[in-house]
Swiss-Prot record:
Keywords: ATP-binding, Nucleotide-binding, Transport. This is Uncharacterized ABC transporter ATP-binding protein HI_1474. The lineage of its organism: Bacteria, Pseudomonadati, Pseudomonadota, Gammaproteobacteria, Pasteurellales. It comes from Haemophilus influenzae (strain ATCC 51907 / DSM 11121 / KW20 / Rd). PANTHER family: SPERMIDINE/PUTRESCINE IMPORT ATP-BINDING PROTEIN POTA (PTHR42781), SPERMIDINE_PUTRESCINE IMPORT ATP-BINDING PROTEIN POTA (PTHR42781:SF4). Disulfide bonds: none annotated. GO terms for biological process: sulfate transmembrane transport. Belongs to the ABC transporter superfamily.
Length: 199
């Protein structure tokens, strides 16, 4: 369970909410409202006041690299000189070939395992980035509009696959999005930010 209490940054003002294990929360709001700042605070990338607890443990005591969280945004950060397999190995060296194949198969890109990022379409690259985020079986998945650069058809295809993976693996998820349809598809629970405040 994630509990955010009186979170404040240079943008956010007294933000409080909670998410149950395996729940998906959508965060909506205009550009500049603090959505990305919220994810950065939870990930441990920026300083803040207030408290963030994960499974009753104060996150301030754990540096970002010790948190089993994965952050995915529009910047895919795929290593261009590594194949799909190579990118997965860098994300989780202990993952077996079978684990890689199963995950890529679920994402419908197992046939691309030996290709390089420049040989993939935008939608395929997004799926590889998802695979890299999920290969470590994260406790918390932070999604910052990762599909906004895709056309609607590609976006909806990925929605279906990702929602199934999240539900099957019971991954707690926070999704930042501008799209009401996307928020509604992924979760029944939403919060809205406006000028750094919950409304």
């Amino acid at each position: 369970m994630l509990i955010v209490q009186n979170l404040q940054t240079n943008i956010l003002k007294s933000i409080s909410f909670s998410i149950e294990k395996s729940e998906c929360l959508s965060v909506v709001g205009e550009s500049g409202s603090g959505k990305t700042t919220l994810l950065n605070a939870i990930a441990g990338y920026i300083d803040y006041s207030g408290s963030i607890l994960w499974n009753n443990q104060v996150l301030e005591n754990n540096p970002p690299w010790k948190r089993n969280f994965r952050y995915l945004n529009q910047r895919l950060y795929l290593f261009p000189h590594k194949t799909v397999r190579g990118n997965l190995i860098l994300a989780n060296p202990s993952a077996s070939d079978a684990e890689q194949q199963i995950l890529l198969s679920e994402l419908k890109i197992d046939h691309l395992i030996n290709r390089y990022p420049h040989q993939l379409s935008g939608g395929e690259q997004q799926r590889v980035a998802l695979a890299r985020a999920l290969i470590y079986r994260p406790d918390l998945l932070l999604l910052d509009e990762p599909f906004s650069s895709l056309d609607w058809s590609s976006r909806k295809d990925i929605w279906k696959v990702l929602k199934n993976l999240i539900q099957t693996n019971e991954i707690t998820t926070i999704l930042v999005t501008h799209e009401p349809k996307e928020a509604e598809y992924f979760s029944g629970k939403q919060i809205q930010l406006y000028q750094g405040q919950l409304i």
